[in-house]
């Protein structure tokens, strides 16, 4: 079975303009049209059995609608995680609702949420999510939106690991996009997962293999 653990999709009515915005930031064309149907078609072409869809909540006001959309995809070929913003004061209630909706985890994106990952607000969310058995996925390392101001560095992630000791934390992009020397320094061997999203064309192959060998693979 092939699982693509890092994908994105949006409601049909906003998918087009959302992709236009993101394509401008990334300077690249998307593989699909940003919809559920487009993602499924792309999965078929790549022989992918299951995709995990990861939403990015950029405003507190988006939380309810994003999680409502995500709740329609708790099983089948596309499994969506929920989302939360670090400025949500009622984060415990939101996380319980995410759990009750049948969602298996949450996605955090410090760059788009304009907060550094070692902020106590993130630590509280991750701790509460861990207590509920939810997986937490975090964008880690350089993002084209603000490449000179990284909001989740491997060093920040290590602090969160030491402070919170979460059971199911996933750092996207092999622990820190374009910061893989620091991934080796601070994160390899720790109780944390890495995904391989958007790194295979930029990460040195020998370093990728070394990290996989040293950290382990599931």
Predicted regions and their residues:
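Active-site phosphate/pyrophosphate- and oxyanion-stabilizing loops and adjacent acidic/basic residues
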Residues: 68-72, 158-159, 184, 209-210
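H/E-rich (His + Asp/Glu) clusters that bind or coordinate divalent metals
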Residues: 174-218
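Hydrophobic beta-strand segments of well-ordered beta-sheets in folded domains
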Residues: 49-51, 135-136, 168-169, 192-194, ...
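Short, glycine/acidic-enriched loop or turn micro-motifs at the edges of active sites
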Residues: 7-9, 142, 176, 198
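Mid-domain alpha/beta scaffold segments of enzyme catalytic cores
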Residues: 1-124, 128, 186, 193-195, ...
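Short helix-capping segments at alpha-helix termini
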Residues: 75-77, 163-167, 188-191, 215-216
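Divalent metal-binding pocket/active-site signature
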Residues: 58-61, 86-89, 101-184
